[in-house]
Amino acid sequence: ATEDLPSFEDNIWAVYRQTAGLSKFPKTTLSKMLAGKMVNVGPSIGNTTHSISGNSTPKDLETAFQLMYLTFMDPRFDENEFQTGIQQIKAVLPNIQNDPDFQYQIEKEKVFYNNNPRVLALNDELLAKANLATIERVYRELFKDAAGAEVTIVGNVDLSTLKPLVEKYIGSLPKGKKATDFNKDNCISVAEGQIEKTVSLKMQTPKSTVHQLYTAKLP
């Protein structure tokens, strides 16, 4: 829903991913538990898809599966952890907003994507609307089961080792009955037609930047 979008702006979603632990384990505890292991697993929520992906060394493969399972079944939503990251954004946001390159990026995306509400610009108003409760509600709805999920595993994996891990950690996920509906209205499309726009910004060191974007439909 449109009102949920501020909570999934790239920087805010990154705050959740970077500050959240798993299950009963805070991020700091989880990091200590994973010390010495080469493994990384995390969720992704986009405009039209959601997923969990990761990577590991062969010896840490089961740890990767365990993290995947917990990311699916027992995510962690801690307001204090989340606010730590939000406060960090608030501290640097004034400088970011005063950066001409940032201002230009905003204007450019407005033109490229025809003011699509799903193309968000980080600002004070958006931060005020973002909240962890929305992230948790949407997350739990999307990852409540594995209906429609596709599993892809590539790399240096011994099949005799892999098979029991898949059966244990993926086979035990709730199957569900129906995959999440695909909503084509959530797609972000480039504006059609020939558009020209000049953006003038105050700079200490003036410069010119030109962006040209050409698009075509695939046959």
Please report, for each region that a protein language model flagged, where it lies by residue.
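M16 family metallopeptidases and their MPP-like homologs
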Residues: 1-18, 22-73, 86-94, 100-127, ...
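A generic secondary-structure signal for well-formed alpha-helical elements
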Residues: 20-21, 72-76, 93, 161, ...
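Surface-exposed patches in mature extracellular/periplasmic domains of secreted proteins
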Residues: 42-44, 77-84, 150, 176-182
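An aromatic/glycine/proline-enriched structural segment found at the starts
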Residues: 112, 145, 150-218
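A conditional alpha-helix N-cap/helix-loop micro-motif detector
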Residues: 128-132
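A short acidic-Thr-Gly-centered motif at the start of a beta-strand
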Residues: 142
